[in-house]
Amino acid sequence: MRYVGKRDLFTVGKYLGTIMQGVGFVVALPVFVAIIYGEGNLQSFIIPAFISLGAGTVLKRYMPEECSVRLKHGMMVACLAWLWAGLIGSLIMISALNIDFTNAFFENMSAWTGSGLTIFSSVESLPKSILFLRSLEQWIGGLGVVIVVIGILIRPGTAASRLYKSEARDERIKPSIANTVKTIWWIYITYTVLGIVLYGLTGMPLFDAINNTLTNLSTGGMSIKNMNIGYYHSAAVYLVTMLLMILGGTSFLVHYQLIKGRFFSVLHDIQLQATVVFISIFTILAVYVGGVAPLESIYHVISALSCTGSSISSTPQMVAWPAYFKVVLITCMLIGMAAGSTTGAVKIIRVITVLKGVYWEIMRILAPEGSVMPRKISGKSVSDTEIREAGSYISLYFVLLFFTWSVLVVYGYDPLNSLFEAASAQGNVGLSMGITSFNLPVVPKMALILSMWLGRLEIIPVIVLIRGLVEAFKAG
């Protein structure tokens, strides 16, 4: 039985067209930065923007919507949207910087997915417009390309709901998806303004404050400085950055409850509680067992756990870290922070669900026959299906991680550093052991691109896309 046919592809194409229009609008915005700083590369942004707007308009207008939007369509749209966004960003960098496609695609996929890995050894030599493009891509990608477009271009209804779920989001702040997305938007914008103001109060220049807020709140982590946040040598800047990383890694539902004054609900959120516990435990382990300085420890633990990838240490300093500290950070990068936030990786709720599932199974075996044991997390009932789904996803996650790690090791990179790099790419983190570079061979570079893409979409949608395309074309 075929589950996807040509009619489904028409529906996917129609909604993909809307996303392409949104991407075209986003990549045109750095033109204003280019004008302000007198850069003569306007056509590098304008032409790709018009390509995206034009192609999107054609698909949206002429593709018939032959069936109602279902989750499979949303997943396929999301997968293709991230690829298209990376492609359009690549065209800009190829034109503006005269670099090859693979490096341009890597940089843009890293930015859009909030991974934060960069092929540039000296970002300070890049045009201001390109730096802003990277920051803007991370800020948009932090929410999700599809989520952003739902809030602006797609009318409320079933289609919006299916597309919302396609980017691994399921929480609802408001009864309708449209109002949920708008609320998320306003929270995100409010925190963005707050971040810019706080950075400004530390004495940071406006351009730096804008870019650092966009990248750290979105848990993207790319910097406009070669030394990342370490460039500023300021405790105040470090504190603001840690605050933004934690805000970015916290569920938007918790932010909404905080804004509404529901402090009891905030304090009893299990993901927030687990975040505090993990930050405390991993920092203590890094300081007292790994022998790493306290500030360096807590900063990078928060950076890794929130999947931001911001750093206050140079790459050579990070490569020289004790193996124990690298293992601590790898663990953080695998776990991530809250579902329903801008963070990547497995996410705390899945880890808790699986651990609780194991505990409940042990207690079921030990309990008297006929006993009924309540299974709840944060007051919500947890089904066998949810436990299996969490376990299955974590299993898939480690299979992909092993694949990426194997590719890097085969190319001669240190096994521990390769695991660090693979976990960073797949968790959309951005901390690097220096493996990612302009001269990284094509095969490991493509493996990291695939890992970033799959990690951002949480694997299943990509499998749905591949299966769907195969079925549709087999059907003729």
Place the predicted regions along the sequence by residue.
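Membrane-proximal intracellular helices of multi-pass ion channels
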Residues: 1-476
